[in-house]
UniProtKB/Swiss-Prot annotation:
Alphabetical UniProt keywords: Cell inner membrane, Cell membrane, Flavoprotein, FMN, Ion transport, Membrane, NAD, Phosphoprotein, Sodium, Sodium transport, Translocase, Transmembrane, Transmembrane helix, Transport, Ubiquinone
Molecular function terms, GO-annotated: FMN binding; oxidoreductase activity, acting on NAD(P)H, quinone or similar compound as acceptor
Modified sites of kind FMN phosphoryl serine: 226
HAMAP family xrefs: NqrC
Subunit structure: Composed of six subunits; NqrA, NqrB, NqrC, NqrD, NqrE and NqrF.
Protein name: Na(+)-translocating NADH-quinone reductase subunit C
Organism name: Neisseria meningitidis serogroup B (strain ATCC BAA-335 / MC58)
Taxon lineage: Bacteria, Pseudomonadati, Pseudomonadota, Betaproteobacteria, Neisseriales
Length: 258
C-alpha cells in the first residue's frame, strides 16, 4: 500500500517549498520575458525625449515618437574619417558596440582624457530639422568618467560645428546635490551660446572654478564637485578632440550638415 503523502513531515515540507519555488521562478521568468519589449520601448522613448529636450523641442504636450520621427534624423558616423556609414543598421548602438572588441578600439592612456578606456568605432549622431526641413542643429552623444560614475549626455551644436545650443546629462551616478547637479537645467544652461573652439580650431571650452568669467568659452565648475566638473571637462576634451568628433565636425564645416 502506497504511503500517504504527509505535507507536515520534513520531506513533505521540503517538497512543498521546492514546488512553490519552482512555480514562482517560472512566473517571474515569464514576467521578465513578457515585460522586456515594454521596457525596451520605454527606454527608447526616454532616450528620444532627452534628444528632443536638448534640441529645445520638448514640452509637456510633446508627442515624443511623432516629433522625433518628423524632426530628428539619426545617422551613424565613422569617428576615424568623419564620414556617414551608409550601411549601418537602424538599431545601431555605440554603447553596445563599445563592448564588442571587433566594433571598438582601445584608447591609449595618454589620449584617454574622458577616462573611458575604449569606445565604439562608430557612433550615432542626430540631425535636427527645422520647419523648413533644413538641418538646424546636430546632437552628439558624449560620455566620460566623473567621480563615481560614467556620465552619459548629449551636446547640441549649431551647423557651424562650434556653437553650443544645449547640453543634457541623462544618466549618471554622481553625488546628489553636488556632482549630481550636472543634471540641473540651470547649470546646463550655462553652456548655451559658448564656443567649443578658438580661432585656430583648438578646443577652448573649459569648465573650472571661475571659468565663467570667460564669456565666450568658460563655464563655472559645480560648487563642491571639482572632480565631477573635471570629468565634464575631460569628456569635452576627448570627444571634441582629434580622436572624437573633430573629423566629423571638419566635414560639416566644409560640406554642410547635409
Amino acid at each position: 500500500m502506497a504511503k500517504k503523502f504527509d505535507k507536515d513531515s520534513f520531506s513533505g515540507t521540503l517538497i512543498v517549498v521546492l514546488a512553490v519555488s519552482l512555480i514562482c521562478s517560472v512566473i517571474v521568468a515569464g514576467a521578465v520575458v513578457g515585460l522586456k519589449p515594454i521596457q525596451e520601448k520605454q527606454k527608447l522613448q526616454d532616450k528620444q525625449g532627452y534628444i528632443l529636450s536638448v534640441a529645445g523641442l520638448m514640452d509637456k504636450d510633446t508627442d515624443i515618437g511623432k516629433t522625433f520621427a518628423e524632426r530628428i534624423e539619426q545617422r551613424v558616423v565613422d569617428l576615424a574619417t568623419g564620414e556617414y556609414v551608409a550601411d549601418a543598421p537602424k538599431d545601431f548602438s555605440a554603447r553596445i558596440a563599445g563592448k564588442d572588441p571587433a566594433q571598438s578600439i582601445r584608447i591609449k592612456t595618454e589620449d584617454d582624457l574622458a577616462g573611458i578606456k575604449s569606445r565604439a568605432k562608430y557612433t550615432e549622431v542626430y540631425l535636427v530639422k527645422g520647419e523648413d526641413g533644413k538641418i538646424g542643429q546636430i546632437i552628439l552623444p558624449m560620455h566620460g568618467n566623473g567621480l563615481w560614475s560614467v556620465m552619459y549626455g548629449f551636446v547640441a551644436i549649431q551647423p557651424d560645428g562650434n556653437t553650443i545650443n544645449g547640453i543634457t546629462y541623462y544618466e549618471q551616478g554622481e553625488t546628489p546635490g553636488l556632482g549630481g547637479e550636472i543634471g540641473n537645467p540651470l547649470w546646463q544652461q550655462k553652456f548655451v551660446g559658448k564656443k567649443l573652439f578658438d580661432g585656430q580650431g583648438k578646443l577652448a571650452l573649459h569648465v573650472g572654478k571661475g571659468a565663467g568669467s570667460d564669456k565666450e568659452h568658460g563655464v563655472d565648475a559645480l560648487s563642491g564637485a571639482s572632480l565631477t566638473s573635471k570629468g565634464v571637462q575631460g569628456s569635452f576634451a576627448y570627444w571634441f578632440g582629434e580622436n572624437g568628433y573633430i573629423p566629423y565636425l571638419n566635414k560639416l564645416k566644409s560640406a554642410g550638415a547635409q
